[in-house]
């Protein structure tokens, strides 16, 4: 294991991070859309308001704060919710409180001390934590004397003996392990994207991992969600999503023995789209049509404008067959084969093309792809065949790779057979 994980602490990653402003569950969907556009990982933590009166000198402890955390709301959650028939009214839909949209799961965020070792933080994230809540403006001490801590760019020596020589335990992250003073309720929020960005800066310390292929590392996740291009796009949201929040849109190859990826329905792709237009498309189009048209044809137009110009006489029936922007010809639907989509590769390249890499791609290359595109994942295709999907690599897989012992690597000739979880009802 790289020493960088032992000698760095969570506080090192908070330098320059802004103070977190809580987003409450009573806020509207309209407010959530604005907040998500400025967020990391295409989602925002959602909180309940404090029920305890603000008494003089009262400071909320970590347990109380953890109970107020509801879950993380992302762009795909909002689009899927708005795709419901009763929500396709712009004025009404935008005023709905996010408490009706967010899926409760308060295990996705955890409050930690700035002195928490980076390796302990990575283990938490590997177990499902997506955000770390870190107190700001603290004066702290108490780590084991075996470590000199780099915090806010300065090396600090600990002045007290630790009660345990084994480092931080899982328990110690649930309560303050340091003597500290802090400004009341000032925190910053670290995401997995922040951690990957930090790791990019210390790649040399991780050698030889960064230049090792993802297939050799054995981190290609084959347990992904997918939907066939000829199925209604709304089917992609019928089942609970795993991490990452993404569904691959696939079509069979000519020999019908393999599937190739032509697009995706994901929080990353919907991050800064026109949410109402995307919701209409999700509710009314085939998956293949959706991945080609939602961004290029609709992102710059309002939902009401789309309805007025797409259907003669202001027709707003989502099943109308004479829509202009999403006609069968314009999106590549083959009229001679009503049960199958025939989509040329050139028609879905561009902004709606999925982010892909090869099984032979290095770990460093995949990390760089994710950061440069602000994506939560990269789809993996066969090394010798474009677009034939074998799996996905997300934040969880990368964190597993950088903390894995070299002896745990798998051979690079690993067989990739089978598929992920098909999303159909």
UniProtKB/Swiss-Prot annotation:
Residue ranges with Polar residues bias: 173-182
Localization per record: Vacuole membrane
SUPFAM superfamilies per UniProt: CBS-domain pair
TM spans (from-to): 200-220, 275-295
InterPro entries according to UniProt: AMPK_gamma/SDS23_families (IPR050511), CBS_dom (IPR000644), CBS_dom_sf (IPR046342)
Pfam families hit by this protein: CBS
Protein name: CBS domain-containing protein CBSX6
Organism, as annotated: Arabidopsis thaliana (Mouse-ear cress)
Taxonomic path: Eukaryota, Viridiplantae, Streptophyta, Embryophyta, Tracheophyta
Gene, per the UniProt record: CBSX6
């Amino acid at each position: 294991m790289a020493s960088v994980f032992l000698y760095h602490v969570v506080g090192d990653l908070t330098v320059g991070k802004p103070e977190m402003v809580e987003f409450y569950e009573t806020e509207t969907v309209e407010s959530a859309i604005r907040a998500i556009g400025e967020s990391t990982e295409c989602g925002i933590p959602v909180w309940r308001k404090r029920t305890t009166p603000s008494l003089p000198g009262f400071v909320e402890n970590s347990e109380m704060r953890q109970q107020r955390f509801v879950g993380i709301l992302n762009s795909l959650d909002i689009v899927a919710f708005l795709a419901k028939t009763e929500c396709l009214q712009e004025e009404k839909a935008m005023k709905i409180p996010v408490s009706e949209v967010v899926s409760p799961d308060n295990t996705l965020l955890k409050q930690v001390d700035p002195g928490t070792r980076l390796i302990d933080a990575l283990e938490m994230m590997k177990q499902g934590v997506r955000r770390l809540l870190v107190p700001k403006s603290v004066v702290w001490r108490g780590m084991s004397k075996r470590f000199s801590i780099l915090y806010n760019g300065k090396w600090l020596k600990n002045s007290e003996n630790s009660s345990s020589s084994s480092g931080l335990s899982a328990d110690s992250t649930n309560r303050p392990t340091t003597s500290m003073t802090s400004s009341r309720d000032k925190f910053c929020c670290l995401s997995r994207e922040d951690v990957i960005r930090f790791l990019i800066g210390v790649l040399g310390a991780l050698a030889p991992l960064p230049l090792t292929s993802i297939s050799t590392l054995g981190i290609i996740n084959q347990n992904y969600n997918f939907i066939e291009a000829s199925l209604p796009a709304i089917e992609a949201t019928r089942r609970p999503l795993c991490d990452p929040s993404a569904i691959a849109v696939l079509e069979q190859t000519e020999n019908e023995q393999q599937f190739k990826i032509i697009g995706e329905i994901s929080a990353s792709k919907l991050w800064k789209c026109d949410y109402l237009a995307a919701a209409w498309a999700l509710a009314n189009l085939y998956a293949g049509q959706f991945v080609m048209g939602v961004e290029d044809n609709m992102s710059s137009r309002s939902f009401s404008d789309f309805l007025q110009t797409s259907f003669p006489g202001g027709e707003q029936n989502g099943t109308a067959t004479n829509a202009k922007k999403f006609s069968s010809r314009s999106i590549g639907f083959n009229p001679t084969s009503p049960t199958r989509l025939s989509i040329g590769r050139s028609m879905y390249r561009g902004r709606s093309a999925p982010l892909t890499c090869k099984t032979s791609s290095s770990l460093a290359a995949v990390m760089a792809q994710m950061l440069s595109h602000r994506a939560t994942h990269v789809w993996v295709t066969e090394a010798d065949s474009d677009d034939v999907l074998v799996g996905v690599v997300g934040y969880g897989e990368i964190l597993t790779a950088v903390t894995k012992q070299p002896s745990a690597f798998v051979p690079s000739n690993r067989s990739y057979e089978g598929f992920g979880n098909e999303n159909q009802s």
